[in-house]
From Swiss-Prot:
Keywords: Hydrolase, Protease, Thiol protease, Ubl conjugation pathway. Residues 197-551 form the USP domain. One of its GO terms (biological process) is protein deubiquitination. Residues 51-104, 163-188, 329-349 are annotated as: Disordered. Pfam families: UCH. It comes from the Eukaryota. It comes from Arabidopsis thaliana (Mouse-ear cress). This is Ubiquitin carboxyl-terminal hydrolase 24. It catalyses: Thiol-dependent hydrolysis of ester, thioester, amide, peptide and isopeptide bonds formed by the C-terminal Gly of ubiquitin (a 76-residue protein attached to proteins as an intracellular targeting signal). InterPro entries: Papain-like_cys_pep_sf, Peptidase_C19, Peptidase_C19_UCH, USP_CS, USP_dom. Recognizes and hydrolyzes the peptide bond at the C-terminal Gly of ubiquitin. Involved in the processing of poly-ubiquitin precursors as well as that of ubiquitinated proteins. The active site is at 206 (nucleophile), 510 (proton acceptor).
Amino acid sequence: MSEKKVFVFGSFTEHETRSFFEQKPTKDPQNSKDKCVGSIQFGSLNLAAENSSVNTNGELKKGEADGTVKSAGSQERLDASRPASSDKNNDSDAKLPRKNSLRVPEHVVQNGIIKEISESNKSLNNGVAVKTDPIGLDNLSMSDGESDPVYKASSSKFQALDNEDFSSDSSSGSIQRKKNLKVPTESVPPVKDFTPRGLINAGNLCFLNATLQALLSCSPFVQLLQKIQLQDIPKADSPTLAAFSEFISELDVPSSSSIRNNVTVVEAGRPFRPAMFEGVLRNFTPDVLNNMSGRPRQEDAQEFLSFIMDQMHDELLKLKEQSPKVTASKSSVISSANDDGDEWETVGPKNKSAVTRTQSFVPSELSEIFGGQLKSVVKAKGTKASATVQPYLLLHLDIHPDGVQGIEDALHLFSAQEDLEGYRASVTGKTGVVSASKSIKIQKLSKIMILHLMRFSYGSQGSTKLRKGVKFPLELNLNRSHLVSLSNESLRYELVATITHHGWDPSKGHYTTDARRKNGQWLRFDDASVTPIGTKLVLHDQAYVLFYKQV
């Protein structure tokens, strides 16, 4: 018999059976094989329809790949990663970043639903128009206890990742750290733009995630982290610096931007869990246990930001075997007679003298980025004016007065003169209450200016939130009236990040961050979700913390 065996079913004569074996193929088997392979369809993805696209009705048409969402006029897209498998046998794969192409920026596929992220006040949910968040954040996942229906979300874009249990660093879903070579800090190259990566929220940790994403938009701060990463940081003495050193190593730096089919491609790495900050959170809230596996309450993002900045400032000084006499968090606006510092009499431009006292402050690499100086002048009847120079890392702006409608109004109120009630001064040897006034102006500008909009107030009946709209610009030009004197410093700042609180109570609600990339593209970070947005969505009026970079 022939080498190939053929089974014939049915009743055939001997002549008919012999003819089957002698029959020659009519086509070349190899050509037939090639033709079949080219038309194989795997699942719902038709490889032969690679040049098709999705029209407005969800039907395929020629021109784009099946499964790709493209908006008309869209010039950028995000290579967003997808949740990894929860299979425990794939631990080795979980350490590698996964990157897939998702064409956006105006449409996002969320749990199988195409959602449009636009400036309009309506979106489609399975073809039905629904009410959206006025800030464009209708798909946020809220913390437990938050009942605001406007910002309540039904699902999270990376829900599968959010529910994963990460018990150790090896299973945290993070990429493997590269071996760091210890080189002089002078050889650190200019800061590059990091691949955006979402941060997993195990429960009430969005204040941490939002703060970290905002800081990553500040290029001088990122460059500082790169220098820290090249040093041996003792974790016991410098837990905050050690956490940031490990955190920055989890981020990839793209070698170059890529353009495909006249569309700029932005790569996004797989979301990971910032477990390296567990010790920092323990120091921030010693009364809260199980910090990274879920917390019983939400924390104030601005308070956490101030805490880690103060900690980094002190730890950087310890590395240089220095210790500050007065830190920014402990400084006061009005100096007392017991304050440490130098005191001298200065003469102003109008030949008016004032007793000036400068608080002792040892600068650090962090304060060189975020730090500036304020000068507070108190004028009392019958006495010489007294001035106090103090450092700052961020400016607290009162937005409660009705006249404050924007950031410029809040800055004007910040530097305006105010009357002091019950001010006691020694006049002609007698101490008594005299009329006095106080004004605060900026003596030294910071490279990164952080503006805290004071939306929360605390009283005997608990905390309340002011939800009034406060406008802020993409480009901020400081008025010279905010400064002590004219200088050669640039008064122009560009917005690089915002932190927004959604909800009514600081112990509840949710935090998100809008951050600008080096190429000017704005991204919205909502825990594990990373979404490109337009500037109209960035310039909403409910921001809580603003980050401006001097240009």
